Each structure stands twice: as structure tokens, then as C-alpha cells.
């Protein structure tokens, strides 16, 4: 009888520890995607990198290998509510532009930085891309990004982020697809993205018992407060860290004439102080 009980206890404890290990692995896998630094949050993501180019387009300089954006599709569908992330090679902003801002210069600098990234990460593929007028490169990859920014124009929200590291997944083989060059009166044949991938981002309304919620630098109650957000303020979801939501908020000025500055905030709010916005 004791032997049977002993075996039963062994089986029970083995199953118990297996469940704990599986739970811990799942938790660590998600939290490993968020790197907390004193300079802000860095997301370390695995997924698919994609870029297309069209040198038959008359607006594309001959020296430019790509005209499309560097896009990243996170493996974790929870990131930015399963939206495509457009990778920006340099620091960027959509607000508070300097009066002397030179769009053409910035565009040229970004194109140059983009090509440098491609040549560094995909040296062999770039050689092939240079011989193809129109095509698409796709590869499993891992990225580290910061300054995640959901930006809405008209009815579409695009998620942008500054890429600070891009790596091919070891052993993975990038794929280059050659596309047909169409006549000027024909439509483009790049794959149209799913409208949901560029649609409205998941949003939450602040709904705290105290009438406001603290947006914190890190997902702890003793972390530095970045901003106090009143109830009814809408924030945009990026990802979560346990019971804390990492969100984005753009504070537009009430008096543009005297102070046109838009203030951007990214930080953590406990999920108990938020409610999902329903359209």
C-alpha cells in the first residue's frame, strides 16, 4: 500500500512541477519580449521581415534598391494588436516638426540608412535584389525596437518604431520573389495588406476609482510616474507585461496658437484602471 502511495505522490509531484514549468515558460517568453531600461522600453521580437522594391517606378532614384518600407510582422499576435510594424532606420517624429525641417534631406538619409541595414543583414540577397527591377524580400528575423508610435491618417492607423537591431533567424533562408513590371496604366501587384493590419489600433479608456490613472515608467507600483491620465482619456495598446499594459498616448494641445506642442507618452498602466473601448 505504501509503495502505491509513494508512486502516486511521485506522479502527482512530477505533473505539478511540469505544469508550473510550462506556466513559467509561457510567462517568461512574453516578458522576455520587453526589455526595461532607464531610457525607455525596448521590444525584442521574433517574426517576419519584409521589404519590396520597384526600380521601374520613375520616382525611384537609380541608386535606390528599395522604395517600399521595411515591415515587420511579429510572431506574437498580441503585439500592437496584430498590426504590421513599420521599421524606421533613424529617429523620427510625426509631431512638432522644426520650421526648417528638410523633408527631402531626411528621406535621403533614411533611404541611405535603410540600404546600409539591408547590406549588413542580407549581403547576398542584396546582390540579387540589385539585378531585379521589382520584387520582394521576406525573411524570418528578430528585431529590437523602441519608440513604438501608432499614427493615424484618415481611417488608417500604422504602427511605426525605430529599429535598433535586426537579425536573421539562424538557419532560416530568406526568400526573394521577382514580380512582374507592369505598364503605367496597370495596377500594382504587390500583395495588398490585410485592412485590419493598418486599421484602428486597440484602444482603452482610463477608468480608475480615483478618477485618474498613473502611467508609470516600469510595470511596478513604485516606479516613476510619467503622467497622470484622467478618466475618459483614450490610450493605445502596444503590449502587456503581466497585469500591466504598455500603452501610448498623444496629448494634443487645447490652444494651438499659443502652444502647438504635442506631447507623447509611453508607459505602463495597470489593467484594472483601463476598460476596452468599444466602437
What feature does the model see in each segment?
Residues 1-30:
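Bacterial Sec-dependent N-terminal signal peptides
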Residues 32-84, 89-90, 143:
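Structural detector for short beta-strands of small beta-barrel domains
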Residues 47-51, 117-154, 237:
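Flexible glycine-rich surface loops and low-complexity tracts that mediate binding to linear polymers
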Residues 72, 232, 245-250:
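SH3/SH3-like beta-barrel fold
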Residues 79-131:
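Beta-strand/loop nucleic-acid-binding surfaces
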Residues 149-183:
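OB-fold/S1-family single-stranded nucleic acid-binding modules
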Residues 177-200, 224, 248-279:
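Boundary regions of SH3-family modules and the immediately adjacent low-complexity/disordered segments
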Residues 192-243, 277:
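Beta-loop motif signature
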